[in-house]
Amino acid sequence: IPAEIPAEEYAKREDFRNVTTFTIDPKDAKDFDDALSIRKLKDNLWEVGVHIADVTHYVTEGSIIDKEAEKRATSVYLVDRTIPMLPERLCNFICSLRPDEEKLAYSAIFEMTDKGEVKNSRIVHTVIKSDRRFTYEEAQQIIETKEGDFKEEILKLDSLAKILREKRFTAGAINFD
C-alpha cells in the first residue's frame, strides 16, 4: 500500500492543512485515528472539524485486508500488546494522523456560534495536517491551567463541548456514569 497521496486526490478533497488541528489520545497510543480542528470564521462563529482517518482510500471493499478487518471487527488492546484490526503499517503509519504529516480524512465539519448553535454542518473528504499530538493528561492540564500549546483552541473546544453537553441533557439525554 503506497503511503504517498496522489496529486489528483488533493483536488477531490477540502483542504484543511492550514487549519489548526490536533489529536488527543492515550499516552501509549500509536494509531491516531481521529483529530479535532478549529478556526474562527468571524465574531462568534467557529468552524469545528472532527476528522477520522480515511482508511477507505487505501482499503477497497472486498479486498483481503477488508475481509480480515471485517472478521476482526476491532483492534484488541491487551496489557502487553495490541492486536490491530488492520495491518500495522496502515493503522500506525499510513492512516495515523501523526503531527506534521499530510493525511486523508473523512470529516464532520460544523459551523457554530459561541453559544453552541450549529448553523451549518457537512461531511466531507479532506486532507489534513495535524499540528500536535496531545495526551489526555496534557489536554486536561491545559484546560485546568489555561496554559500551554494551542490553549485558545483547546479552551474554545472545551467550552463548546460543555455547552453542547448541557443542551443534550436539557433535551433528555441520559448520563450513565
Predicted regions and their residues:
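Electropositive polyanion-binding surfaces
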Residues: 1-177
